[in-house]
């Protein structure tokens, strides 16, 4: 999915978003970056010379007062990076209110987009304690902003890092815009790899069951760290840590 995100930024730079001015022809392009966050996201925007604005993260997601201030008043702000579920490094997930506030924004830039990296959509550690995040595409559509989000996902942290299946979900208008590039960029994707994944998983239930096996390996490691932190540092008021339900 990192490739898809890179392509999306690159396409916006060279050809613009749905008929808007290509970013490379603008004097300034800015991006909101919730911190702490994913370094590979920030590497992409840094590589293209995009000015990055730090947005503090809270337990419910990015500081929405700041996000709304920048998005609604500054037309040079073209996007925001988001990892809505089990966000690194805290493991926090976006609250319902945060998702709704994002979906209801009225950006100053007509080509503003939410870059929604759903990297850990089914990466739960527990069966009985799982975070659930509102469906951003549905919320944007309800708010009258169907084109405002690109939703990315992949099997990189399910099957093969860097060699899985990536996907982008977005509005019909955005998809039509993206396909203009894709039909030039490639004849077709790796259908053998796609078939391999389908035959292995069969359906979403197969994927969920597979992720339970990952959780059985990871859970003891998470719990070991939590137990040591509690035992050695608990009550000393010299540090804080989170206890994520997945990631």
Regions found by a protein language model. Name each.
Residues 1-110, 121-144:
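Conserved core of the PLP fold type I
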Residues 118:
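Walker B catalytic acidic pair
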